[in-house]
Amino acid sequence: MKKSHLYNRSLLSVTIILLIFSIIMVGSSSVSVGNRIRTDYLSFLKKNFIHSIISILCMIFVFNVPIYKWKKNKNKLILCSIILLLTLNYFGISNHGAKRWINIKIAFIQPSELVKISFSCYLSSYLSEKNKKTSTIQLISIILIVSKLLLSQPDFGTLVILYSSLLFMLFLIGKNFLFLSASSAIFTTIVLSLIYFRSYRAKRLISFLNPWSNYLGDGYQLVHSMLSFGRGKMFGQGIGNSIQKINFLPEPHTDFIISIIGEELGYLGIAMIVISLFFIFFQGMNIGRNALKDFQYFSGFLAYSISLLIIIQSIINIGSSIGILPIKGTTLPIISYGGSSKLITCIKIAILLRIDFETKMNKIQAFRR
């Protein structure tokens, strides 16, 4: 029997289209940065092309990995993530005051990206188990350890993404109100404490509320991001015609690439990106629902968790760029420049494709019996 009709072609097609779009937009947005930092205005385009090819090859490999192996190796994955986070204190590369990358000569690794997958696997395994008395303590311990290590970098953005996905997961599976309220209270307390004890986070919050009050200081990024959107209007200025990317807007090819998309392709271009990302999200949630209907609890919860991670990160990135959320320094999934982020996001989508494939195969086998 041919299995080609079991592949989720729409999800795969949207992912490939976004990867191609990423190559174009990173190439356009990074011209000035590449010329200034590396004296080669195409340097980021070339590296992003390589990242995209590697990501596609990894997707093919991951798609052929049975889902049960992710559950089987969840402890190894989370342990590996914790070890990599620990090594950042000794071998991490500092950038803008944060140690988030490890230089392995041939590439830079961002351990916090691996945490997103390993934590999803661990959480999904926990939720799919019937006896949770001992595993609850282990889960809480891992959450606290990972939180401490992420804050030591500091990487507040990844922590917000993980906690947000955790709370939404608990809500989706119908956890009791008391447990959900307690988790929300703990998360809120941590966030407020971090803002209070870290002056630069408080300044970011103030600048987010009124960026024009200090447009040459903490509000600089947001002001120039807004100017990009204002200049783009409905249809944009055309690819390559952004002004803000020319040494005005910091990180135009990473954290603020949506601003350059808005300036060059307008609100229409932004709408297409938002629709594509939400398409991936709803596809993932539908895949998870079908897996749960087939009593594949780990697969279903994993699909939910992955989908939430992708859309929450997307909302935070776009929201901070348009001024409705504080700036967190997160990339736009698939689109932004960044090898680790692109690779891990593509691996997540490959896992979704595999879950969908296995669910369809199970239905066919059950029908034959």
UniProtKB/Swiss-Prot annotation:
Any idea of its EC number? 2.4.99.28
Catalytic reactions of this protein: [GlcNAc-(1->4)-Mur2Ac(oyl-L-Ala-gamma-D-Glu-L-Lys-D-Ala-D-Ala)](n)-di-trans,octa-cis-undecaprenyl diphosphate + beta-D-GlcNAc-(1->4)-Mur2Ac(oyl-L-Ala-gamma-D-Glu-L-Lys-D-Ala-D-Ala)-di-trans,octa-cis-undecaprenyl diphosphate = [GlcNAc-(1->4)-Mur2Ac(oyl-L-Ala-gamma-D-Glu-L-Lys-D-Ala-D-Ala)](n+1)-di-trans,octa-cis-undecaprenyl diphosphate + di-trans,octa-cis-undecaprenyl diphosphate + H(+)
Membrane topology term: Multi-pass membrane protein
Q: Any stretches that span the bilayer, and where are they?
A: 11-31, 48-68, 77-97, 134-151, 154-174, 177-197, 265-285, 306-326
This protein's UniProt keywords: Cell cycle, Cell division, Cell inner membrane, Cell membrane, Cell shape, Cell wall biogenesis/degradation, Glycosyltransferase, Membrane, Peptidoglycan synthesis, Transferase, Transmembrane, Transmembrane helix
User: Which InterPro entries does the protein's record reference?
Assistant: FtsW, FtsW/RodA
- GO BP of this protein: cell wall organization; FtsZ-dependent cytokinesis; peptidoglycan biosynthetic process; regulation of cell shape
- GO cellular-component terms in the record? cell division site; plasma membrane
UniProt KW Cell wall biogenesis/degradation keyword: yes
One matching Pfam family, short form? FTSW_RODA_SPOVE
Q: Where in the cell is it found?
A: Cell inner membrane
GO MF, one term, reads: peptidoglycan glycosyltransferase activity
The pathway it acts in is: Cell wall biogenesis; peptidoglycan biosynthesis
- Principal location class: membrane
Family indicated by similarity: Belongs to the SEDS family. FtsW subfamily.
Question: What is the protein's known function?
Answer: Peptidoglycan polymerase that is essential for cell division.
Protein known as: Probable peptidoglycan glycosyltransferase FtsW
Q: Give the source species.
A: Riesia pediculicola (strain USDA)
Identify the gene encoding this protein. Answer: ftsW
